Amino acid sequence: KLKLLSLFVFVGTFSTIAQENVTYQKPSAEILALADYERAPSVSMDTKKEYMLLSYRNTYKTLDDLNQTEMKLGGLRINPVTNISSTVTYINNLKIRKIKDKNEIQVSGLPANARITNISWSPNEKKIAFTNTTNQGVELWVIDVATATAKKLTSDNLNANLGSPFNWMKDNETLLVKVLPKNRPALIDNNKDLPKGPTVSTSDGSKSQNRTYQDLLKNKTDEANFDAL
């Protein structure tokens, strides 16, 4: 009886330990020094080789980025809340430097907690447009290269589900922007809403060497969501 009681107490103790809430923790200082390094910035230059744009990224994706909502449609992986690819690795800071000058100039006016992507120089290379992703959507911003200042142009209503949501026009002053229509139907969450039809797959045809594709449209709900993009 004593041996059986001891075993029972041990098992009970193990169960209690296993159910403890464990939070995210930092590794030791030695490991952190090796893993948590600062990435070198990526560089983009104008064709006249007068200015360069330095783009800085986090070494790793944040927990918020890894935990974001993801919808898989027709080979795309998007965030249905922000309407941009869920696989984007964002830029968090921008600096400008004259090629003939060693000093880097911090771009002023950038959004707080910047999540920047879709960087594009204007045709005359005097301005740089980019998008910033908020918790609700995607905004359009523009930088004046000579003064290294950024300014927001739109609210967070851009449609970046199918690539860059804007294009520069030849006049260097106009941007053609894709925005979400106000009457766009809401995307259907397969995990919450009743699907519009069953999942259907076919096995007709003969064997072939064709490649396979991920995240194909599987039912009427997927089709409706893809049309809404």
Predicted regions and their residues:
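Beta-propeller folds
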Residues: 18-229
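Bacterial Sec-dependent N-terminal signal peptides
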Residues: 1-22
